[in-house]
Amino acid sequence: KLNIPTANYVTFDNYVDSMNYLNSCSFPLVIKADGLAAGQGVIICNSLEDSTEAINKCFKDKTFGSAGSRVIIEEFLEGEEVSLFTLVDNTGFVLPLITAQDHKKILEGEKGLNTGGMGAYAPVPSITKSKMADLSNQFVLPIVEYLKKQNINFNGMFYAGLIITKKGPQLLEINVRFGDPETQ
């Protein structure tokens, strides 16, 4: 709707359709529980076997509770992940605060399963103040303006999870809270 760059994706609300789709996919890809999953609902899958296990966690094992009743299967994006924190208000004001980078993987060297976060640092050295302003204008401002047009008043923290790819920055997620562990 807003032409914000993000991964190509499809959504499914049942096991059979998601498995049928996966049989036509190339890997790696990402499977996400479509809801709050304590930072553990994103699974990078390198094979059909990995994907089947992820789909089973969502639909059969109910590992993520109601968050796993709908899944997002999306293109795997490669690059540097950055959390962009801004304050916004319902007038369209956007104040970029800081960028941070967290370490999600359970094992050293960014290996293993995702966790809620193993630690973070801020600011991200590769993101200058000028680049941070550009990212805010590209990713946050269009959403804030859209909310305003829809008569949705939002004031507060807006956190954009981004990945800087060879094709340019892409949106991974948005939250309306401070990040954890980034704010620690």
What are these regions (language model features)?
Residues 1-41:
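A conserved helix-loop-beta module that forms one wall/lid of the active-site cleft
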Residues 41-183:
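Internal nucleotide-binding/catalytic subdomain
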